[in-house]
Amino acid sequence: MNRTRTATVAASVAWVLAATWLQLMRGPGLRAYDVVWAEDGGVFLNQAMRHSLWHNLVTPHAGYLQVIAKLIAQPVAALPLAWAAAALATGAALVVALISLLVWFHSGRVLRSPWARVLVTAVVPLLPQAGFEVNAAVNDLHWYLAYAAFWVLVAPPRSVAGQVGSAAVVALAALSDPLTALVLPAAIVGIVRSPRRLLACVTPAVMLVALAVQGWVHLTRAAGYRASETVLGELPSIYGLRVLLSALTGDRLLGPVYQWAGLVLVAVVGAVAALVAGFLLWRADRVGRQVAAVGLVCSVAYLVVPVGLRGTGGFLERAEFSLNGSRYTIVPLLLLWVAVAALLDRLRPRTVVGGVVAVFLSVQVLSDWAAPSVRTGGPSWRASVAEARAACSAPARPSQPAPLVAEEDGRYAVPIVPGPDDVTIVVAPVPPPGEPLLFAVVAPCAEVRG
């Protein structure tokens, strides 16, 4: 192994470890490694504790297979229960770090400036808006896999081995979330630019097969879900607020700014962004124009379609503004930064352009890094397991509550009702007093004691 390759491997390992650690340490209060989040424990860990990997892989949750979450949760179930929070969070953070490394290598095929490649790479684990809801959460890895799929499609490898690896990435992404289909337009750019167009068609073809499997599962085994009605006219405003304005302010300032200026500011920001994007698209070279255009198209689609399916209720509340639903903005924001990087990639002086972008994003990251998240208030997994152990040792154990969310969602849902030798361990978010329990891990006392 020559020195260059050795340095590359060493730098890659160092980055993955650093990016993983940063995600685990993000936010105030309790850290991600001591809090089990919602479906991570209430669905996927419960499944892994009760069924085989194959059973879990073919059982949908919330309308899709969520393969990546189940691949992580299954080995976690074999560990001591007290390790579950740390193992789930570390697994999720490691996957995100590896995706960022993949982006670094693929982006070199379409971006020339080192700062542009650093931007689209570092924003994966450090995205300011990821801290509130999706940081180090197994349940939300499918958003990051969609971003990975975008990159392997827009910048396809030229070797057979590279195509095999890319096919594995898009298959995992598509089998985790059917919405990954929204990044398929990137394949057009990748195929047109590739000197080996037939080979470049392999990865999109594999993705279509995986999406067909997801479609069959969704049609035959999934139940529909809608949180609210969809008002189509609100979707542009939601994109302007939660993506464009959020990209300028970060999460911590978004609420105060929106409450102060309302949709008028959102409209102004949207109009200015459209004018600037049009000018930069006109000035950009062919590669930058293609990558930026497909990035913007996929960014808008990845907000409009998921939110349209979920319902638009709550996103534009001004007086009681909330960051709830920020998971729907992760892919749109990541792809928006791809467009920014592609449009500014060739501008000179590159050092100045890259420095301005780096300072701008660094201020956001530092501002949002300590912002509260859905995990900040716990409950602490270590403390909860200790309480469960004490409850299992008590001579008279009170009846245990049954979580409302089943381990298997959809038409084949199987609610978990605690047995006489089971204990219920509540996970985040804890419901308000008087509200039914949503998410919990139901574990046998024999496993809790062990």
Regions found by a protein language model. Name each.
Residues 149-165:
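Membrane-interface transmembrane helices that cradle and orient dolichyl/undecaprenyl
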Residues 153-158, 187, 275-281, 334-346:
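Alpha-helical transmembrane segments in multipass membrane proteins, preferentially the mid-helix core
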Residues 2-50, 54-131, 160-161, 189-191, ...:
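Intrinsically disordered, polar/acidic, low-complexity terminal segments
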Residues 141-143, 316-345:
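Hydrophobic/aromatic-rich transmembrane helices and adjacent perimembrane loops
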Residues 17, 285-316:
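Transmembrane alpha-helix segments characteristic
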Residues 168-189:
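Transmembrane helices and adjacent periplasmic/lumenal helix-loop junctions
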Residues 130-149:
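Multi-pass, polyprenyl lipid-linked donor-dependent membrane glycosyltransferases
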